[in-house]
Amino acid sequence: MELQMTFQQAVQWFTDFDRCFSFMTKLRWPDGKVTCPRCGSQHVKYLDNARVWKCYAKHSSAKFSLKTGTVFEDSPLGLEMWLPVVWMVVNCKNGVSSWEIHRHMGVTQKTAWFMLHRVRLAMQDDLTGGMLSGDVEVDETFIGGKMRNMHKDRKVEAQKGGHRDGNKTIVMGILERASGSKQKRVRASIISDRKRKTMAPEIAAHVEEGTTIHSDEFGVSWQMPEKYDHQMVNHLSNYVQGNVHTNGIENFWSLLKRGIGGTYVAVEPFHLFRYVDEQAFRFNTRKDGEGEVISDFDRFKMALSQIVGKRLTYKALTGKEAETPREEVPF
């Protein structure tokens, strides 16, 4: 497969099932040793007619396919349908809507919507890059409908809460600036409020001690613990004060809102974190450690390298059952 190819070429390449099968088998088991995703045993045999493997270890579910133990598990759609969708989602800068998938792939809009959320789960940050360090920017933004556009009943309810942004959802972002061989990285999550007791644990979970943290006085106005060097800029007077600014994370907010407002139009708060994960993945896979632009194919492979051990059922997606936690299973 060419490292540089257009979307049209990728679709043509993946129309052949055997080609998809060979590609995914090599990606999942690069050393050629197929392991059972349920028990990790290598005592398996490939059944040509059924296109599945059989594990000879003693457990109830002996047979497994390429999709077992991945975000694709139990999907009636073949890899020749899934792989072009993954390519589109990870490489379209502003995302792709379920209606576009419906039109291009010939599936229902409901199926396309479910497919997209499963791909977003694969794009969720596995935190394999380690803690953020150096110069880090911390900020938050509000996502949701404007007060003036709300129905009267919802507007009254929002005003009762006493929040200037009504019932908008708060997204907190932490961005590590580029330095040397390190490229920009962002971690973003949904938070309930802007209080220190809520934001401080998020910072502690993602930022190394001794890091210089940049924020604006309106956002993180409280003083950081002494283990961090906290620098603040007052946006009422200027946006940049020497090296102190939050321009990097604000650029990420711009990309996030462009995708939500332009591509998806409206996003339910219940699912917002999935769209945040999607944009964060694309942001973090723009350049490699040498500063070279990551190709669409390499970004595509990065997303596929994160499909194992993640499962999202339709009931979990719609809130009818708890979402399955990620399991550590052999890739």
Model-predicted segments: where are they?
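Residue-level recognition of single "structural anchor" positions
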Residues: 1-331
